[in-house]
Structures are given as structure tokens and as C-alpha cells.
A protein has these predicted regions:
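Alpha/beta catalytic cores of nucleotide-metabolism and tRNA/nucleoside-modifying enzymes
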Residues: 3-7, 12, 16-17, 27-28, ...
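Alpha/beta enzyme core
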Residues: 35-37, 84-98, 102-108, 112, ...
Length: 264
């Protein structure tokens, strides 16, 4: 395996997050993946979309189901009062950070003006952010696409994001209409690096050490990445990324992993 051609900063300070994937990265998956492999700096839950959490959503964020992991619950809504109500409940469970989903490209979600669909109404989005950043008891991070249909939507969105003290902005540099097809627009991430002062995280098409090398070559300032589908395709991907960047990696034995899988 080729070693990542990265800077010393990347070798020692790269952070890795597990992406939220609806119906897939539930607490059962997160817990057992963490026991078999581990090493993620943050684990993001699939989105919560009900003001009054249903049993599945509540089980996913219960502290006893997230032991040993820095878990960040994600909320999908376009109503400030719903976001704040859920944030209050999550604060009661001891969480310190909540993530706003502005990235889901699903047609059913977008049709309700949520997820990436909320990006299509920037004035309403800014009003929403005004209220939640003023009143939320938790730190807020955001996961975003770069627009709905056109690349020129990104610059106005960056101007909105500049106004708010977000914990972190996680950018999947594709438009909503692109789904997961085509090549991520790395130049859009570079524009965010120039425009924003908050911490940034890159998300999109990290499936191998080589793919991460290509991204870092073009975006050398990246020190945090979020991985989703790549982990589902190759559960050991994170360890391959760390090994390629010369980080020391301690893995459970095959027998220990098998024992966990039998429990699952």
C-alpha cells in the first residue's frame, strides 16, 4: 500500500468522523464497529426528524447506547422551535454538540424544504439560524451541500455561514441535484477555506488511502474528514488511512472481532 503523501500536520493531527447514514449507522452499528475497529474522533447519528423522538430515535441517542464514543446527534428540520426542543432534550442526556442536516439530497426530504432543500430558501435559512444560534443550549455544527442546482448558490451561502459561531462546518462539495454522482467540487471547499474562520471538515468520496491523498493534494489545509459509504464498503478503511499516514494503529484480534460480530 502506498503511503499518503501528506504534510506533517496531517500525519499527526488528522481527525476522522463517521458520517450519519439513515437506517445504517444506528447505535448498533456504531457500537459494534467501534468495538471491532474504533478510532473515529466523532460519530454522527442518523438524523432525528421528530420533535417528540420516537422510540428508534430515542434509543439511538441514549447515553447507555453510546458509551466510549464522542457522539453527535443530528437534527433534520426547517423549524427553529423543533430544533430547539430537540436540542433541549439532547442537552438533558448530557450532549454538548448537535448537528444540523443541510446536506441530505433525498427527494422526499428536499420536497419538504429540509436537508439540502433548505438551501434553496436562503432568507428563511438565515432567519432559522439567527434564532437557533441565539437560543440553543448546545454548540451547533452544520453538515451542508454547496447548493441545490447551481454552483453560484455557494457564495451567498458562505456569506450566511460567516455570520454564525458554528462549532464546525462539514462540507460535502456537491449540489443537491447531483446526489452522489460525478466528482466533488473541490474548488467549492477551497472557497470555504478562504471565506470562513470556523473549523471545516471535508466529506465525500473517501474510499481508499489513494482517494484521500488526491483530495489532500488539492486541499492541503484539510485536517478533518468525514467518512460514510467508504466504511460500509470496507469496515477497515479507517485503519488503512491511518496506517498509510504513518499513524500507529492498534486493532482487536480476529478472535475479538468475531466475538463482537456473534453478539451483533
Amino acid at each position: 500500500m502506498e503511503r499518503l503523501q501528506v504534510t506533517e500536520r496531517h500525519t499527526f493531527f488528522m481527525k476522522y468522523y463517521l458520517a450519519p447514514m439513515e437506517g445504517l449507522t444506528t447505535y448498533n452499528f456504531r457500537t459494534n464497529w467501534n468495538r471491532c475497529y474504533g478510532g473515529m474522533d466523532k460519530y454522527f447519528t442518523p438524523f432525528i426528524s421528530n420533535r417528540h423522538m420516537n422510540s428508534r430515535e430515542r434509543n439511538d441517542v441514549l447515553p447507555e447506547h453510546n458509551v466510549g464514543m464522542y457522539t453527535v446527534p443530528q437534527i433534520l428540520t426547517n423549524k427553529a422551535e423543533e430544533f430547539l426542543s430537540l436540542a433541549e432534550q439532547l442537552a438533558g442526556y448530557g450532549y454538548h454538540e448537535v448537528n444540523l442536516n443541510l446536506g441530505c439530497p433525498s427527494g422526499t426530504v428536499v420536497a419538504r424544504n429540509r436537508g439540502a432543500g433548505f438551501l434553496g430558501t436562503p432568507r428563511e435559512l438565515e432567519d432559522f439560524l439567527d434564532e437557533v444560534f441565539e437560543k440553543c443550549p448546545l454548540e451547533i455544527s452544520i453538515k451542508t451541500r454547496i447548493g441545490m442546482d447551481y454552483m453560484d448558490e455557494w457564495a451567498p451561502l458562505l456569506k450566511i455561514y460567516q455570520k454564525f459561531p458554528m462549532k464546525e462546518l462539514i462540507i460535502h462539495p456537491r449540489l443537491q441535484k447531483e446526489g452522489y454522482k460525478g466528482t466533488p467540487h473541490l474548488e467549492a471547499f477551497a472557497e470555504a477555506v478562504e471565506a470562513l474562520q470556523c473549523p471545516l471538515c471535508y466529506n465525500g468520496d473517501i474510499t481508499s488511502p489513494e482517494s484521500l491523498t488526491q483530495i489532500l493534494t488539492k486541499l492541503p489545509s484539510i485536517d478533518t474528514v468525514m467518512i460514510g459509504r467508504g466504511i460500509l464498503q470496507n469496515p477497515g478503511l479507517l485503519q488503512e488511512l491511518k496506517a498509510a499516514s504513518t499513524e500507529s494503529v492498534a486493532l482487536p484480534s480476529c478472535e475479538e472481532r468475531l466475538a463482537v460480530l456473534k453478539e451483533f
